[in-house]
Amino acid sequence: MSWVRVNKNKPCPICGKPDWCSVTVDGACRCMRVQEAPGWKAIKQHVDGGVTFRPANEDTNEYKERYRPKPPPVRLYDWRNIQDELYQASEAATRKQLAEELGVRVIALTALGVGWHEKKEAHTFPMYHEQGVVVGIRMRSRSGKKYALPGSKDGLFGIFDMSYKSTDPILVAEGPTDVAALLDLGFHFSVGRPSCRGAVGILKKLLKCRDVVIISDADGPGVDGAKSLAHSLIGIVNRLKIVVPPENDVREWRNKGATRDDVQLLISNTQECKDAGQIQSITSE
């Protein structure tokens, strides 16, 4: 039942007072002052005070409050241990096969902590929050289907030592395979979002007072997500740029021959985003 407090305009139908008591739209009344009332039948005495009444002329079937099952206990996952097991299960040949499929070197996948789920026959990518703790596992099946293990929370792909101070900007890409491409190109301070609009809260904590380059996918949703993130980071980060690669995403660009110098040149030639107007002017064209 959804209880509504009585007021001066709609006082308690039992005691006539404008406060303390409550009613429901289906005719029940919880009166805080009266134990018995003509024309009403008491159906529950509350230990914290008051009596719930129903009209005495209702259906002869005894009214019972709707059963509310207790919520199931929250299951706690030891993601660190799960990640370790999945990582150990990934044989060199399995990781090499994925590296060839993605067009990156095995070392980049190793840096991401890529593992293998034998039962589901899927590659695994750990997701982290801003303090470097594993909060979930993203799966990638042999067919390319992407999903997360039950209980996972969205986090970032890739993590680095935040205590290490560098003049290099932190690169933020979309998804684990784009981060793999950036790592393969030598951009070691790179992380990936779980989606084009995911992990904003984590990034706001991670990127505070840092130089940041958002590497957007070149489609509409990718650019819109990058712009949305940029709006959230203005005033939090030090310097901010949004880079849109000439191909669909940075991994495709890498596979078509882009080098670290190519990416660095694009970043250098991209105007810094200092206000909302500059962010909004960015397009996927």
Where are these regions (language model features)?
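Short phosphate-binding/catalytic loops that engage adenosine nucleotides
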Residues: 186-188, 237-238, 245, 258
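Residues within well-ordered alpha-helices
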Residues: 94-95, 105, 178, 202, ...
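TOPRIM metal-binding catalytic domain and adjacent DNA-binding surface shared by DnaG-type primases
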Residues: 1-32, 43-135, 156, 161-167, ...
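Conserved beta-strand -> loop -> alpha-helix junction used to position metal-binding or nucleic-acid-contacting
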Residues: 242-252
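Phosphate-handling DNA/RNA-contact segment within nucleic-acid enzymes
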Residues: 117-211, 226
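Alpha-helical scaffold elements adjacent to nucleotide-binding pockets in ATP/GTP-utilizing enzyme cores
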Residues: 30, 228-232, 249
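Short, surface-exposed amphipathic charged segments that create phosphate/polyanion-binding patches used
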Residues: 205-209, 251-264
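Conserved catalytic cores of soluble enzyme domains
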Residues: 8, 35-37, 44, 164-167, ...
